[in-house]
Design a protein with these regions (language model features):
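Residues at alpha-helix caps and immediate loop-helix transition turns in enzyme cores, especially N-
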Residues: 40, 73-74, 101, 132, ...
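Flexible mid-to-C-terminal extensions adjoining Fe-S/redox cofactors in radical SAM and related proteins
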Residues: 3, 25, 29, 267-268, ...
Length: 341
């Protein structure tokens, strides 16, 4: 199988929740909510598949929103993906998941349904809405029982950093299929609840120990944050491969490399977590977008102010979106990177 190319596809903006850290509903992003119609959905899908054929990549779609299950053509899209044998997962809310919905997802080859837990009960319900924590735990079982992997995604900030180790206990106790976390991406400087590099490294130490303790559990732990590479490198658990080409990026952030985000308007972003529009999938060829000058702005790896001086440049680079949210420059130093250069 050819290497995967990931599309994060927002098919609508509408959602049952108004999460406090959501970039769609942030005060800097007050906009009309859009729903992509089904004809446009088919156009975008064909455009993405044409790109993958031309570049010899295997498409992988993360269908999201808003809450994608609220889209009037949600099931039609899933049936289309199923018929074409296209790999996909869902990123959504727990509120509309029933036993019948979970079984239908399984019958249409949904590989994974991602839910969010952003802390323990009080913290999560503060971020999301009252009752969301308990409903999410309930729906983990509903999905897993139907054969759809329930994954848990956590957004980490200074607000909930101390709860993450205990949250991992909860996730494992409820037999989630997968757990991962990413850092909060500030939408404005004054709202940035920034962890210090030392605080974040200490969190990774605690989480790494939890992962070792739960090595035999039913939960798979992903190392989503690219600063894990630095963490393992310093522990002697990651070694830079030998005899590699100097001008090839091998790992780290997929922005500009193997990922695009598509919004309900058709707008294409290099990364959804920062202002990075590069085209429109309803007007432009996705192939031309990805190969074009706008995307090249996100592939200037020598411009990373700190990472370009680091031996892990081609394998890490931290999170450019977090850097952008902090300084409005994706090439500035990752604010949680603790390495001294």
């Amino acid at each position: 199988m050819a290497d995967f190319f990931a599309f994060q596809w927002h098919i609508l903006d509408d959602c049952d929740q108004r999460c406090k850290h959501c970039y769609i509903f942030s005060e800097e992003n007050d906009k009309e909510l859009i729903t992509m119609n089904y004809e446009d959905i088919k156009t975008v899908l064909d455009n993405c598949l044409d790109f993958c054929q031309k570049t010899n990549r295997t498409p992988y779609f993360s269908i999201t929103g808003g809450d994608p299950i609220l889209h009037p053509n949600f099931w039609q899209l899933l049936e289309l993906l199923h018929e074409k044998q296209i790999h996909y997962s869902i990123l959504g809310n727990p509120f509309h998941i029933t036993e019948d919905v979970a079984k239908r997802l399984k019958s249409l080859s949904c590989r994974q349904y991602q839910l969010s837990l952003d802390g323990l009960r009080e913290t999560h319900d503060y971020f999301r809405k009252p009752g969301s924590f308990d409903i999410t735990l309930e729906k983990i079982k509903t999905l897993q029982d139907a054969g759809v992997r329930a994954s848990i995604m956590t957004t980490v900030s200074k607000t909930n950093i101390d709860e993450i180790p205990d949250l991992i206990d909860v996730v494992v106790e409820n037999n989630a299929g997968l757990f991962s976390f990413a850092r909060y991406c500030p939408t404005s400087l004054e709202k940035a609840t920034q962890m210090t590099p030392g605080e974040y490294k200490e969190l990774l130490e605690k989480v790494w120990q939890k992962y070792q303790d739960y090595n035999d559990s039913k939960t798979f732990f992903t190392l989503k944050d690219h600063l894990w590479t630095l963490f393992l490198y310093e522990k002697g658990l990651y070694t830079i491969p030998e005899n590699l080409s100097d001008d090839v990026i091998y790992d780290g952030c997929n922005c500009g490399n193997s990922h695009l985000t598509i919004l309900p308007s058709g707008d294409v972003f290099a990364c959804r977590r920062m202002d990075s529009k590069v085209g429109n999938a309803l007007k432009d060829s996705v192939y031309d977008i990805f190969m074009g000058e706008n995307m090249d702005e996100y592939r200037q790896f020598e411009n990373f102010e700190k990472c370009s001086k680091c031996e892990l440049l081609r394998f890490c680079r931290g999170c450019p979106a977090v850097s952008y949210g902090t300084t409005h420059n994706m090439y500035s130093a990752d604010p949680q990177c603790w390495k001294e250069i």
